[in-house]
């Protein structure tokens, strides 16, 4: 995950997509329940014979498909919400660092480095020059030396620029970790190109569920409980 990509990323778009998959999951659930609880029962009461039995079997298979759609779309929704939650945290850190840099009239470059203007007391009649710094995240010893050098720089802007560059790099590191966590989980959420929901499909659902719930732990813990005695507006917001 690089600076330009995270800057352009909009976590809300993934949350919106999650809402769409959640709506499909809900519709599939409703369709499954209607087939199981209403249509099949009505058919049994009104029809008999081989044709009725065959039709009932087809409806049961259709209900299985709706059930599978409900489960898979629910998992995709949760995964997208988890991804948006993790990326949102990283994006807020990035935006805060960039905002602080801009407040000091620094320039954040396309690679995440930070350029700062000349400032400080004159030396030999000259104001200390500005410069550009990159993040000091890697070897602890080298990082410590770099930060110490920034503190002793006659230009006071150097220290602040180094701080902002490090914060930007921290945000990018967090976003990269989120991307690496969620990309394989989302790629795994795919169905076979057929209309038969097999035992193997349900084994995959169970496996996918475990992976998604593990990855979305922080997101799920962030969800507040339904307000007790909440108003209709509060319940809708929840």
Please give the residue ranges for each predicted region.
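Long, low-complexity, intrinsically disordered regions
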Residues: 201-238
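N-terminal secretion-targeting helices of virulence/extracellular proteins
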Residues: 1-200, 204, 214
């Amino acid at each position: 995950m690089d600076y330009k990509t995270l800057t352009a990323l909009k976590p809300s778009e993934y949350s919106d997509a999650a809402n769409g998959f959640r709506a499909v999951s809900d519709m599939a659930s409703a369709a499954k329940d209607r087939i199981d609880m209403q249509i099949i029962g009505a058919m049994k009461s009104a029809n008999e014979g081989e044709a009725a039995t065959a039709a009932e079997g087809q409806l049961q298979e259709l209900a299985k498909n709706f059930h599978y759609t409900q489960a898979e779309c629910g998992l995709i929704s949760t995964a997208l919400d988890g991804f948006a939650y993790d990326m949102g945290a990283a994006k807020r850190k990035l935006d805060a660092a960039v905002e602080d840099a801009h407040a000091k009239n620094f320039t954040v470059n396309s690679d995440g480095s930070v350029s700062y203007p000349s400032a400080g007391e004159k030396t030999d009649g000259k104001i200390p020059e500005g410069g550009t710094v990159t993040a000091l995240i890697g070897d602890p010893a080298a990082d410590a030396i770099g930060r110490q050098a920034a503190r002793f720089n006659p230009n006071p802007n150097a220290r602040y620029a180094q701080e902002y560059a490090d914060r930007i790099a921290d945000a990018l590191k967090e976003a990269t970790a989120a991307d690496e966590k969620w990309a394989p989980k989302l790629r795994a959420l795919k169905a076979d190109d057929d209309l038969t929901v097999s035992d193997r499909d349900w084994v995959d659902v169970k496996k996918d569920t475990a992976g998604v719930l593990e990855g979305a732990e922080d997101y799920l813990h962030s969800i507040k409980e339904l307000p007790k005695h909440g108003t209709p507006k509060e319940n809708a917001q929840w």
